[in-house]
């Protein structure tokens, strides 16, 4: 059993797309794998209201598009509530009193339950790695406590090299393994895409797991084949967390 944490260099860099690719790639190797997004929060474009009797989130009566994508990416029979601990209708509970509702004990229990049920859990964070999570701790603090290996998603755009290298430095300071990184093309008009990826390959001391091109509705597509270094994930699954 193992968990991987999918960290992004920023918000809207494609963490959910990369998590879907990881889930599909691992399933292609026969691994029983699910996604897990502890805290889901976003704007109007990615939440959907549900009737109160159908509410699957802990507090607000909404479901989140990222959690739905994770739910529909796995072949395992999971519900929305199985793979999400908290859903909020606004973009950042850490900026409001809602942050007081988030309890790490619940998140830890939910992750333990998934780890005990499935061979692998792909955990998707919210916003960036240093974003406050709950009870005075950041996502970085939490994954260090969990000793959870990290896969870094880099949304390839101007400025991403600085963001990526700073995030890598934080991961190294945490003392958790950086399994590798995924290049996600989020700007189809970026003329120097290849040069940026080459520069990141040169400076990130971890393997490139794959390159996901700019895609229309990636949440509806097969993405696993874009991860060309899946052996790295399979190896780490057995080496780091049993």
From Swiss-Prot:
It is an enzyme of class 6 (ligase). The keyword Cytoplasm applies. GO terms for cellular component: cytosol. It is found in: Cytoplasm. ATP binds at residues 12-17, 66, 184-185, 213-215, 220. It catalyses: (7R,8S)-7,8-diammoniononanoate + CO2 + ATP = (4R,5S)-dethiobiotin + ADP + phosphate + 3 H(+). Keywords: ATP-binding, Biotin biosynthesis, Cytoplasm, Ligase, Magnesium, Metal-binding, Nucleotide-binding. GO terms for molecular function: ATP binding; dethiobiotin synthase activity; magnesium ion binding. The keyword Translocase does not apply. One of its GO terms (biological process) is biotin biosynthetic process. Belongs to the dethiobiotin synthetase family. PANTHER family: DETHIOBIOTIN SYNTHETASE (PTHR43210:SF5). HAMAP family: BioD (MF_00336). Homodimer. Catalyzes a mechanistically unusual reaction, the ATP-dependent insertion of CO2 between the N7 and N8 nitrogen atoms of 7,8-diaminopelargonic acid (DAPA, also called 7,8-diammoniononanoate) to form a ureido ring. This is ATP-dependent dethiobiotin synthetase BioD 1. It comes from Haemophilus influenzae (strain ATCC 51907 / DSM 11121 / KW20 / Rd). The lineage of its organism: Bacteria, Pseudomonadati, Pseudomonadota, Gammaproteobacteria, Pasteurellales. The gene is bioD1.
């Amino acid at each position: 059993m193992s968990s991987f944490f999918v960290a992004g260099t920023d918000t809207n860099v494609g963490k959910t797309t990369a998590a879907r690719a990881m889930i599909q790639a691992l399933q292609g190797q026969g691994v029983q794998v699910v996604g897990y997004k502890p805290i889901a929060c976003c704007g109007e474009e990615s939440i959907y209201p549900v009737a109160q009797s159908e509410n699957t989130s802990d507090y607000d009566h909404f479901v989140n598009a990222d959690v739905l994508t994770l739910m529909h990416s796995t072949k395992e029979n999971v519900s929305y509530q199985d793979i999400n601990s908290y859903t909020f209708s606004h973009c950042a509970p850490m900026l409001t009193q809602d942050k007081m509702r988030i309890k790490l004990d619940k998140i830890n229990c939910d992750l333990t339950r998934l780890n005990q049920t499935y061979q692998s859990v792909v955990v998707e964070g919210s916003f960036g790695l240093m974003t406050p999570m709950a009870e005075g701790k950041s996502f970085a603090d939490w994954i260090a406590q969990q000793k959870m290996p990290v896969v870094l998603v880099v949304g390839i755009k101007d400025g991403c090299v600085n963001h990526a290298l700073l995030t890598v430095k934080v991961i190294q300071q945490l003392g958790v393994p950086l399994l590798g990184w995924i290049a996600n093309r989020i700007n189809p008009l970026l003329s120097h895409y290849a040069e940026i990826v080459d520069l990141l390959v040169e400076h990130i001391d971890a393997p490139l797991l794959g390159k996901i091109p700019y895609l229309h509705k990636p949440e509806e597509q097969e993405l696993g084949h874009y991860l060309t270094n899946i052996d790295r994930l399979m190896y780490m699954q057995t080496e780091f967390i049993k």
